[in-house]
């Protein structure tokens, strides 16, 4: 499948794969940030905040899966080592050192704002060049 995907996308496919791997790194870090935040959150609204964070963690994991599949379809290899996530990520990782619900939510909102910017730039770059990847990013 990788050969056909590369053929359809044409020149620039390696750059697209690199950007998808950077987005994949972001999704893995976002997954962990939501997941660990759901575990350590404290305060009177702990239960609903934990439930919301857990739901978002599942969404981020699904995004990572879709990105990895597309990278493979294009003939690339998804990032293989967790240490590469921090090196490649656009948005980084904010450890939930303050377990207060409001602080954890604020960290995650900042992460989502960064992801929106990354995906917006990727959409502009992909428009008219790679319809399949464009649609995937739009879905995410």
Residues of each region from the PLM?
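Disorder-to-helix initiation segments
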Residues: 2-23, 101
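Charge-rich, acidic-biased intrinsically disordered regions
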Residues: 5, 10-11, 47-48, 54-55, ...
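Acidic/histidine-rich alpha-helical segments that form the ligand environment
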Residues: 19-26, 30-33, 37, 65, ...
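Conserved alpha-helical segments that form or flank metal/cofactor-binding pockets of metalloenzymes
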Residues: 30, 35-37, 41-84
């Amino acid at each position: 499948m990788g050969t056909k995907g590369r053929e359809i996308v044409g020149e620039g496919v390696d750059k697209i794969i690199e950007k998808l791997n950077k987005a994949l790194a972001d999704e893995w870090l976002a997954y962990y940030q939501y997941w660990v935040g759901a575990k350590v959150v404290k305060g009177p609204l702990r239960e609903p905040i934990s439930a919301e964070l857990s739901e978002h963690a599942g969404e981020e994991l699904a995004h990572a899966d879709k990105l990895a599949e597309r990278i493979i379809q294009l003939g690339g290899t998804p990032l293989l080592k967790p240490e590469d996530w921090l090196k490649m990520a656009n948005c980084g990782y904010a450890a939930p050192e303050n377990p207060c619900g409001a602080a954890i939510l604020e960290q995650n909102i900042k992460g989502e704002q960064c992801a929106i910017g990354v995906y917006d730039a990727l959409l502009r770059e992909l428009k008219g060049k790679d319809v399949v990847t464009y649609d995937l990013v739009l879905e995410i």
